[in-house]
């Protein structure tokens, strides 16, 4: 997963070298989400039919091809190709790798181990790229060469993994899994989906355009700082997800929305004050809110969905989440062409605050109404 966020601190260098603006940066980033969504819809259950290891090997091969596109430095076409391949790989990894971790981890620790591997990888990508780009030669080459080395290690480890699935015989046809949200799930799915959309929009902001904020608004040209800020968002999300069990999904979901509201208000304030400290504080607060909202939304939707429709319902939730990580940041890029990146960031922060506030308030009212109904029935 580190490869999917590896280019984050490097977008400014690509912008200088290829001569495109912030809008194109966000479009290049958003292509990744298209790849993830396509992979989830087309191949989300392939590891159940083919086995975990074949799908993991395919994802590793796609990741290597993505790194190769960036290494060739062939301009925008290869940047788009690299991001699309990276999205395909992430879509395959999200299902097969998560399942393997859940199946092989010690009892009771699988959920946290899967979350830690996912968020840890996403966070380490920009941190590694930022450090190498800032303090080592060939900033647009070395990060992806290092990624290929890590992929070789991952390939060797995957060879050593036991297969945890016995593919059915005869092998069933490989068809797109599609999406389906049953009628009885929709009252839970709609607010949960909006919370996921909002939380992943925060991820999109930090992974696509926060390096532009750091260099253009805060006037900090150190790429390692940009990478560390994105790293902090994903680490904070991991903390938020680990806290969800303590509160329970009905409380954690509106609490996550509150974290998103406070975090994005801090991000907006950091742009007004040109303050790195306030930006980092907003990144951590928003990351915790995202983690709480996402994990509790996934728990609530999974618990409500009938078993025969659970896979399609969860796929639909992930599609909503990845639309959130892509569409809003393209809007930020478009706004930045006329308003400038600082003002576009302020508009984005305000929109997230309004949406998260509305969703959180509705969730809290629903929870209180359900509690009152239970008390009356008792």
Model-flagged regions — what are they?
Residues 142-158, 345-362:
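Symmetry-related core transmembrane helices of the 12-TM Major Facilitator Superfamily/SLC fold
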Residues 296-349:
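A late C-terminal transmembrane helix in Major Facilitator Superfamily
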Residues 252-295:
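C-terminal transmembrane helical hairpin of 12-TM major facilitator-type secondary transporters
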Residues 82-118:
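Cytoplasmic helix-loop-helix junction between adjacent transmembrane helices
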Residues 107, 112-159:
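Helix-loop-helix hairpin linking two adjacent transmembrane segments in secondary transporters
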Residues 37-76:
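Conserved MFS/SLC helix-loop-helix module at the cytosolic interface between two early adjacent transmembrane helices
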Residues 19, 51, 72-77, 137, ...:
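Helix-breaking motifs and short loop linkers at transmembrane-helix boundaries and internal kinks
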Residues 225-249, 259, 263:
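Transmembrane alpha-helices of Major Facilitator/SLC transporters
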């Amino acid at each position: 997963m580190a490869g999917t966020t590896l280019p984050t601190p490097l977008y400014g260098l690509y912008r200088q070298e290829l001569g495109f603006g912030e809008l194109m940066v966000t479009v290049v980033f958003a292509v990744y989400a298209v790849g993830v969504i396509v992979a989830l819809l087309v191949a989300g259950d392939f590891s159940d039919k083919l086995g975990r290891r074949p799908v993991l090997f395919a994802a590793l091969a796609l990741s290597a091809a993505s790194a190769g596109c960036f290494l060739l430095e062939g301009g925008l076409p290869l940047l788009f190709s690299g991001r699309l391949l990276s999205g395909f790989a992430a879509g395959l990894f999200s299902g097969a790798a998560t399942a393997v971790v859940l199946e092989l981890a010690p009892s009771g620790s699988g959920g946290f181990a899967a979350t830690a591997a996912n968020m840890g990888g996403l966070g380490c990508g920009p941190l590694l790229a930022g450090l190498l780009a800032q303090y080592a030669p060939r900033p647009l080459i070395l990060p992806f060469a290092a990624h290929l080395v890590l992929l070789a290690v991952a390939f060797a480890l995957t060879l050593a993994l036991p297969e945890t699935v016995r593919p059915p015989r005869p092998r069933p046809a490989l068809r797109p899994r599609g999406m389906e949200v049953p009628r009885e799930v929709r009252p839970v799915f709609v607010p949960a989906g909006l919370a996921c959309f909002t939380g992943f929009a925060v991820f999109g902001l930090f992974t696509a355009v926060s390096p532009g904020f750091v260099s253009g608004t805060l006037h900090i040209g150190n790429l390692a700082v940009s990478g560390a800020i994105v790293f902090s968002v994903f680490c904070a999300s991991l903390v938020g997800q680990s806290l969800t069990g303590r509160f329970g999904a009905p409380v954690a979901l509106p609490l996550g929305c509150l974290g998103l509201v406070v975090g994005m208000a801090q991000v907006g304030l950091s742009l007004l004050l040109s303050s790195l400290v306030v930006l980092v504080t907003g990144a951590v607060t928003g990351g915790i809110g995202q983690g709480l909202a996402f994990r509790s939304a996934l728990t609530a939707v999974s618990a409500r969905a009938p078993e025969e429709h659970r896979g399609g319902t969860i796929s639909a939730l992930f599609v909503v989440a990845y639309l959130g990580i892509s569409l809003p940041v393209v809007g930020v890029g478009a706004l930045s062409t006329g308003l400038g990146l600082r003002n576009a960031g302020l508009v984005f922060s305000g929109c997230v605050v309004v949406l998260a506030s509305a969703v959180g308030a509705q969730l809290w009212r629903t929870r209180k109404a359900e509690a009152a109904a239970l008390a009356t029935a008792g």
